[in-house]
């Protein structure tokens, strides 16, 4: 099944309030802000009108503006909290575009923290969608060292030789 790329909304969620690595979404990676990798790959597939960077951060807005991208809206504070889910952010973005009369058939989530994806990765995933498959999720094999556990104090972390350390 051939997908019309203009029926695809590419959403790049980029919250400004990272706790473990402040401003991680705009930190340079190989001389380029991390978020720009996701924006660039989306631009290889579609035009800016089908790309939504959902952010609450003026710094992120400034960085992507320097790349010539106009952020369509600033994410509401309640969707930039530690308790807001990615699903909440995606629903907000889809509803924003619906109010503008743009009803996308497909949604591609581009996490800023996955900068190594290629155009072919996305087109290959989109080619998997058909009448019997309406959702595709990319995953990777997990290593035992990455398994998250919860202590009796309800802290989330990873167990390293019977000691707790923050999960990375």
Where are these regions (language model features)?
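A short, N-terminal amphipathic alpha-helix
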Residues: 34-50, 62
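Short phosphate-binding loop-to-helix
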Residues: 58-108, 116-117, 124
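Hydrophobic targeting segments
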Residues: 7-12, 35, 50-53
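Conserved core of the sugar-phosphate nucleotidyltransferase
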Residues: 86-88, 92, 106, 112-161
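N-terminal nucleotide-binding beta1-loop-alpha1 segment
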Residues: 1-22
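Conserved acidic residues
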Residues: 8-9, 49, 70, 105, ...
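Conserved SAM-binding loop
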Residues: 27-28, 53, 109
């Amino acid at each position: 099944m051939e997908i019309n790329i203009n029926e695809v909304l590419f959403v790049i969620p980029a919250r400004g309030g990272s706790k473990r690595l402040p401003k991680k979404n705009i930190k340079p990676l190989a001389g380029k802000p991390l978020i720009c990798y996701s924006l660039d790959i989306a631009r290889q597939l579609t035009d800016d009108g089908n790309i939504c960077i959902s952010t609450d951060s003026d710094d992120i807005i400034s960085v992507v503006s320097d790349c010539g991208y106009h952020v369509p809206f600033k994410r509401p504070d309640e969707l930039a909290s530690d308790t807001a889910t990615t699903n909440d952010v995606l629903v907000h973005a889809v509803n924003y575009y619906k109010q503008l009369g743009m009803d996308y058939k497909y949604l591609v989530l581009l996490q800023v923290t996955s900068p190594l994806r290629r155009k072919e990765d996305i087109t290959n995933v989109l080619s998997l969608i058909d009448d019997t498959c309406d959702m595709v999720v990319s995953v990777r094999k997990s290593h035992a060292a990455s398994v998250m556990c919860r202590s009796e104090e309800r802290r989330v972390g990873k167990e390293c030789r019977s000691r707790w350390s923050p999960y990375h």
